[in-house]
Structure formats: C-alpha cells, structure tokens
Amino acid sequence: MSSISNNPDFSSIDPAVLMSLLMKSSGSLPTPPDTHSDGSESPDSTASDSSDKKRRRKPESKDIVRVAEEAEAAAATCSSIPSSSDTKENETEEDQNMTCDTTTNNAQKPTEQTATSADVVTSSVPSGLEGVPSFLFSQFMAPSFQKQLEIFTSGNMMSATHSDTSPSDVDSVLDGGVVTAEETSSSKSPMMTSSDTPKTPLTASSPPHSSGSESRVMSPITHTNISDELSISTTPTVAFTPNGSIPSPGTGYSWSIRREGKLACPTPGCDGSGHQTGLYTHHRSLSGCPRRPDKTVIQMLALRQDTVLRCTTAGCSGKGHVNGNRTSHRSLSGCPIAHQEKLARKGIKTTPQRTKTPIKGISISDECPLDLTLSGLPAGLSAQQLLAAAQAGLIPSSQMMDALFQQFSQTQPLATLEEESKKENEMEVDVETTSDDIPTLIKEEEEVKCESPVPSVIPEIQSTPSRPVAAPVAPGSAEKSSPTSQMLLQMPGFSEALLKMTAPQVPFPQYSPQAALFGNQSALLAQIMLTQLQMQQGF
C-alpha cells in the first residue's frame, strides 16, 4: 500500500483509542456497494442494480471530510489487523476498512471494482479539495474514461514519433483530438497528484489490455499511414517547389514531359515548372527558370551538344523576335518562323510588310519633267534632242538671242531683205485694191461709150465688156508683182522657210517675217525662243 506507507507512523498511539474511534465511525461510514445489510460479501440478484444506484448517489461533503479524518487515524491499525481471522470482529473491521484491502477483494469481483475505487477516491480526498464534488472523481475513475485516456495518450505518443514532413487533414484532426484530451487530463491531473490516492486502484480498475483495446490503440497508426499515402500522392517528386507555388490539380510537375518533347528547360534537374517572376506556372528557357545556374554553369551547358540553348526551329538562327522590340530569341514563343507556321496552320494569311510610298502631292508634280513636246519642229530635230541641248547649255538664252538679232540687222543683206519684204507687202495690198476697183472703171468706160453717137460700136463693147478689160488689167497686175515675187523666190532658203511656215500650229503665234528669213538655223532659234516663252508664261 503506497498510500499507507507514505502516512506518518501512529504506533505510539494507544490501540484502544483507535478502536473506539473506529467503532464510533462505523455508523457514519456508507455501506459498501454490492454488499448486504448484514455485512456479508456474497452478491445477491440485485447487485448490479444496487451498484448502479450507488454510482448515481452523490455523497455529501461532510461525510467525505469525516471519513478522511478518521481514515488517517485508523491507518496504523490496518497493518496490525490479520487478514485471515475468522471472528466476527475481524469481519466487521474488514467491512469498515475496505480501503485497506480492496485490491484483494476486487480481483475476484469485477462488478465491484468501480464502486470500491470511487469510494477509495472519495475517502482519500484531502481537506484542501473540500469544495470539489465527489461526482467528478467518480466519473474520472470510471473504466470507460480510463480506456479513452489510455487510447488518447497512446495515440499522442504514436503521433509524436510520426514525422511532420507531410501533415494532412487526417493528422490534424487526430492531433486536435489528442490536444483536447491532454487539456482535459491536465486540468484534472493536479487532483490526482495532490491527493493521496493509491495507484493500485487505477491498475486494478483498468482491466488487462485485450485484442480489441489494442486495435483501438493502434487505430491512430492506421490513420497516419493513410495520411502518409495521401501526402505522398499530393507532394511533388522533386525536392523543391518554385516560389512555393503548387501546380494546378491534374498537371503535377510532369508538365514538360507531357509536352510531346517540343522544348524543355535546359537546366539540369528542372522539369519546367514555375517561373522566375512568379507570374506563370511553367517556363521553357533559362530566362524564366527559378533554378537558373550561374554564368559558369551556363557556359558549361553551352558546350554540351544535348543542351538546348537556342531556338529549335529548323533553319532558324535565333535572330529576330515576334514582338519586334527584340533582336534575338531562344524559344518557340518568340521565333518568327514558328509564328508564321502557326498562322499558316490556322489558315490566317499574313500580309508582308510594304515600304511606305510617298504621298502624292505638289512635291511630286514639281519633280516631274514638263511636257515640252513641240509640233512643227525643224527637220531632223525632236523634243528629246531639244531637251538634251537645253540641259547641256547649247541653247542660248533670251538675251543672247536679242544680241544675235541686232548683229544680223546691222549687216547689208539683212536690211535689203527687210526692205524688199516691206515693199512686197505693200505691193500685195495695192494689187488687192486695184483688183477691187477694176469693175468700176469698166462701167464708166461703158457709160462713156454708150453716149457716143456710133451705134455700131456699142453692141460690140457690150458683147465683150469684161474680157478686153480683164485681159489688160490682169496681165498689168501680174507684170507689176512678178519682179518682187521672182526676187523673193531667188533668195536662198526663202522658199523652204515659206513651205515650213505656211501652216503654223494653233497654240503658237505666227512667225515674224524676219525670223522666216534665217533658214533652218533661224527656225530652230525661233522654236527655242517660243519654248522659253511658254515655260515663263506657264503654258
């Protein structure tokens, strides 16, 4: 008895006094559960019913205090009483002192264990816990509560040995249950430690572990195994997670493997998951790899032939980019050739970039050459030849042309030609006027002849009035104009100039008679002068 050995020694006290105290307290002590009123320990048919009633009964606090005080006084006599005596006194003392040998009696009676253990607890409550009701202690010592406590404590020990690398919802639920059990047990543990309750009732009240209890104790282990399987199925196979991001369900970290081998990150051990910026779930190049090595490792990777560090498109050198703001690329997303192929597969026609054409306006019209094609140019010359001569500086300017005219006018043949041309013009005017006056002169002569008294002559004159008059007048006028016309025809180049200048073009004014006398050269100069005038006037 651990509780009895811990109590102080009462051997110096008179045994008679102790016996008297026990006899007085026999009436106040409660009747032990599952026993008859006559003190016999044989159970009757109503043993189970009485045990339930005793369990439900709530003892008074004054009885608890009285029993506790008298139990200390009677503790010394418990060891001196022989357990094998057959007298009636010994039987009554054994009935009164059930607290001393409850372990020997309860081993044969499993139905009495709960009540006796509860009485032991209530009888051994110290004076410091008088306000605590005994009902709580009886519930605490119930075998069902003790079994649950053992299950939770064993589960707590198992969960402590279990690794916390991959906790799951199942583990968290079990841990929460263990924590609550620990809190409730810790709240009541001071009552057990501070009290003088013997440990043997606890062991006696708890039955030996059976197969069912072992299965219940081992049930947290089975739950942890299931949680381990769940955590293994959800955790990635690689030892690190890029930026702490978890891939979407169903994708996992085998994204680059399921891409049909198009392109993967060249970093050794990287499966293409995550991104350097944290904005994407995967990457395909070193620029977005969160596990990107330093420059020396990249250079070593470049020496390896199986490492992809540039665009994998056939015929692509890595130059250019789809966006246009970059000069190179290393992946299919920026390859312009792959982009064109993708658009071709979709059936989208891309228009090639065209160079900007200049806007049609005044500047272009100013740059266009003028249309200087002239009709009626001298023989052997064309508009292209005139333009070439003008660009080469062979065509004289207007001032040069004026000087040339003055120089030609000072010479004698030019002056005589001008005078003859003037006289010719005057003679032509006189010929026209004389031809108009001829009919009037003929009429006057006819009138004069009619007044003559010779009648035979008049009919002859009337018969041919116009013939004799027209005959002498026409040859007279022809004779007067013949010398000038012959002189003009005999002049060198005059006839050719007349043939060419007889039908001038409509938009150009007629040539002056002075310009017509210079021959082919004068005609060329005249045409050049006219072109310059047209350019100045804007024709």
Swiss-Prot record:
Disruption phenotype: Knockout in the rectal epithelial Y cell results in impaired formation of the PDA motor neuron. Knockout in Pn lineages (the precursor cells of the ventral epidermis of newly hatched animals) results in the defective formation of ventral cord motor neurons. GO terms for molecular function: zinc ion binding. Zn(2+) 1 binds at residues 265, 270, 283, 289. InterPro entries: Znf_C2H2C, Znf_C2H2C_sf. A zinc finger (CCHHC-type) spans 256-299, 302-345. Gene3D superfamilies: 4.10.320.30. The keyword Transcription applies. Residues 40-49, 181-198, 205-215 have a biased composition (Low complexity). Belongs to the MYT1 family. PANTHER family: MYELIN TRANSCRIPTION FACTOR 1-LIKE PROTEIN, MYELIN TRANSCRIPTION FACTOR 1-RELATED. Interacts with MuvB corepressor complex components lin-9, lin-52 and rba-1; the interaction is required to suppress the activation of non-neuronal genes in neurons. Interacts with sin-3; the interaction is weak. This is Zinc finger protein ztf-11. It comes from Caenorhabditis elegans.
